[in-house]
Curated annotation (Swiss-Prot):
The gene is pxpA. Pfam families: LamB_YcsF. It catalyses: 5-oxo-L-proline + ATP + 2 H2O = L-glutamate + ADP + phosphate + H(+). Forms a complex composed of PxpA, PxpB and PxpC. It comes from Chloroflexus aggregans (strain MD-66 / DSM 9485). Catalyzes the cleavage of 5-oxoproline to form L-glutamate coupled to the hydrolysis of ATP to ADP and inorganic phosphate. This is 5-oxoprolinase subunit A. Its EC number is 3.5.2.9.
Amino acid sequence: MLSIDLNCDCGESYGAFQIGDDEGILPFVSSANIACGGHAGDPIVMRHTVRRCRELGVAVGAHPSYPDLHGFGRRVLPMSPAEIEAWVLAQIGALAAIARAEGVELRHVKPHGALYNVAARDHVVATAVARAVAAFSHELALVGLADSALIDAGREMGLPVLAEAFADRAYEADGRLRDRRYPDALIIDPTACLKQTLSIVRDGVVIAIDGTPVPLQADTICVHGDTPGAAARAAALRHGLEAAGITVRTPR
């Protein structure tokens, strides 16, 4: 029987700023990537999100970023590999401490935003991220864009790796995610999200924005929680996958 991990980025509120629909989306995913202070996620939010994941049986992972609260982690900051490694390690440690206090162990690490995108193509940055994960624990899985430099760096460090694809992001013909600057970069329609996900999981193919079929093997599928209608899309994905005979579960 086919199975797939369904993950979401969450815990991205901070202080008075509320971002995303965690309560609406978490019941439908199997893994959660929790912001840990770099771009969002203060200690109160982190603890609440970990508790909610524990209640729902959702696997918990860290979602570190460039130290960029003002830009929500979507800006590329000029940092050395050593600085990136230290910042990622610190964020993993912060969430791990809170999780352990709640009786939860981290399962994976997925970079956020600009750090995710740069690590997908820049082996130096990817290696810095992988070093941080390995320094914390070789048991943590490193999540990165399928067929990316980050997946390669994780393997080189001896880490378990999870190749990620997206239910709600459009792809270019070369396999890159379509830049968010374009209005068609996000897939909002739940039916379209399910169609893309089924193609990836069952056929190992995603249809690019220009109609090109692109080979894509994924261990985990991300659905974003910070866009309008996120909960409805997550529900449609979960129910649609199960109706197609595909089990939604953590990969290990």
